[in-house]
Amino acid sequence: MSEKANDWRALAASEDTSAYGPQRIVCLTEEPTEWLYLLGEERRIVGISGYTVRPPRAREEKPKVSAFLSAKIDKIVELRPDCVIGFSDLQADIASQLVRLGLQVTIFNQRSVAEIFSMMYQLAAMVGQEARGLALMQAMQNRLLAISQAAATLKRRPRVYFEEWYDPHISGIAWVSEVLGIAGGDDCFPELAAKA
C-alpha cells in the first residue's frame, strides 16, 4: 500500500477508493497484467510474467519476474510489491515462499467463464475500478452472447480437440470447453473438462 493507504485517517477523509488497493502489483501470470492495462491501471504493475504477450508494450515497460511454475523471488522482493497476484495451485509453492517473506499474495483459481469474470471483477475492485471493470465485462459478455446466438444458426457443430500443452498432454480445460460451446463447437473430451 502507498504511504497514504497506510494512514487510515487519510483514507477515511478521501473519496478516492483506489488508494485502498495495492499500488505496486506483481503479476505472476498474463491475465491480471492484460486486465490491469485494460482498466487503465498499468502504472500499478511493477513486475510481470515472462509469458506476457498482451498488451505488447507490457513486455517493454515492465520487468519479467516469473514463468508459470517458477519465479525470481529475490527480484520480486526487490520490487517491493504490496500485492502479488497469481493463479491456481500450480503457483502455490511460489505463493508460499512470498508469504513467508511477508508479502501479500492473492491467488485466483478461475476455471470457468463465470469464474474468469468473477476474478476480473475482484481485481477491478481491488484497484478501485469497479465501474470501468463492469462496463468492460458487460461489453465482453455481450460479444459472447452475440457469438452464441450466431453459432446457434450453424447447420452442424464441429467437434474440436484442444491441447494446451504436449508434454505432458494437457487438455480438458473447463473454460476452453465452454468457449468452444459458445462458438458453436463441441469439445471432443467434455468429460475431462467437467473434472477440470
Q: What are these model-predicted stretches?
A:
Residues 1-196:
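N-terminal ligand-binding lobe of clamshell/alpha-beta domains
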